[in-house]
Amino acid sequence: MSKEKNIEDVLLMKGMNMNSVRLSHYPADPEFLEACDSLGLYVMDELGGWHGKYDTPTGVRLIEGMIERDVNHPSIIWWSNGNEKGWNTELDGEFHKYDPQKRPVIHPQGNFSGFETMHYRSYGESQNYMRLPEIFMPTEFLHGLYDGGHGAGLYDYWEMMRKHPRCIGGF
């Protein structure tokens, strides 16, 4: 995409009151990261992939490449060790080998590094987890596929999340 389109995308996100983006399903285009840097959109930079973890030798090479490419972008405030069940905890230490800032490494759909990021928690489960000491930051929200379509709506989740000081939003 062009520089202008990347800027337009970031402005569109900010116009929807978003202050961060997870790069799991968004290409890690250097122009997009430049737009995030200049316009103030925080970034969770995530190893690509879908649902299966990388073996350690492959993961090490991918982490090294991702961090060497993206390390100088101030908008990146978290590294993510893969989508859903696609992470390999043996790789966690690799992130800090290449990042002199030692930004937090998180695992979407898990509880690591003080962040509770589990995908698709029900409304009741979310209430319980917000009482724990970890920062509550779901990286995907529940939808009808998992609760038969009878769960709380996004508005209900946001209202609940606003009341808890350890909840910092979601993706």
Tell what function each PLM region has.
Residues M1-K3:
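Active-site mouth loops of central-metabolism enzymes
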Residues I7-L12, S20-F171:
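Substrate-binding/catalytic cleft of secreted carbohydrate-active enzymes
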